[in-house]
Design a protein with these regions (language model features):
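Buried hydrophobic positions in well-ordered alpha/beta secondary-structure cores of metabolic enzymes
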Residues: 6, 27, 55-57, 71, ...
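Short, surface-exposed connector motifs at secondary-structure boundaries
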Residues: 8-12, 65-68, 159-160
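Short amphipathic alpha-helical segments
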Residues: 4, 82-85, 116
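Active-site/ligand-binding-proximal alpha/beta "capping" segment
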Residues: 29-94, 175
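Flexible, glycine/proline-enriched loop segments at strand-loop-helix junctions
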Residues: 11-18, 40-44, 70-73, 135-138
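Active-site/ligand-binding loops adjacent to catalytic centers
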Residues: 18-38, 89-185
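PLP-dependent aspartate aminotransferase-fold enzymes
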Residues: 1-8, 103, 107
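A glycine-rich helix N-cap at a beta->alpha junction
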Residues: 3-22, 26
Length: 185
């Protein structure tokens, strides 16, 4: 399913056994030793483009985010870092006056960011997890490469008056939400 676009556009596709985290190790090695550009959430240019999510949400609410709550799925953590970065930029520029409450959402089958933020600050230690199969295939990541960026941006977000949290959801909740979104857009 995820290969239809690259295969359809004529890309050479290599299959790597294992899960996303195994593939990430191979891709990082290739990028370090060959002329290969990483285009995942580790690439700052991609994050800059994804900041448009935050701009679109703010525009949708006529630039008034007071009392709003955003939920963003977390796999490799590119989307959530882009949203935080975009919101912080708009706040710094005076485009918005309030930061919304922001929640990352992780499947119980791949939840290292939730595990980190579910503990009191003094007890937080980041540990990658071994993922289990999930209906949220794109989020089956046990060691998000963007985690250092998440930590830095959460600190900045909270220092600017924003609230951040992460929720863990069941596989059934993901399936139910997918059906709801498909029915209602």
């Amino acid at each position: 399913q995820q290969l239809s676009q690259p295969l359809g556009s004529g890309a050479t596709v290599l299959e790597v056994p294992g899960v996303f985290d195994d593939c990430m190790k191979v891709v990082e090695h290739l990028a370090e030793h060959y002329r290969v550009a990483l285009l995942n959430s580790k690439n700052s240019w991609r994050i800059l483009g994804q900041e448009s999510y935050a701009y679109e949400v703010a525009q949708w609410f006529n630039w008034d985010l007071e009392g709003k709550v955003l939920f963003v799925p977390v796999g490799n953590a590119g989307n959530i870092t882009a949203v935080m970065s975009g919101l912080l930029k708009m706040r710094r520029l005076g485009i918005i006056s309030d930061l919304p409450r922001l929640f990352g959402v992780q499947s119980e089958h791949a939840d290292p960011v939730w595990r980190y933020y579910s503990k009191p600050k003094a007890e937080r230690v980041y540990n990658p997890v071994t993922v289990r199969p999930s209906v949220a295939q794109a989020a089956m990541i046990g060691n998000p490469v963007s985690f250092p960026r998440v930590k830095a941006l959460v600190d900045a977000y909270e220092a600017a008056g924003g609230e951040f949290g992460v929720v863990q959801v069941t596989e059934q909740a993901i399936m139910d939400a997918t059906i709801l979104a498909n029915r209602h857009g």
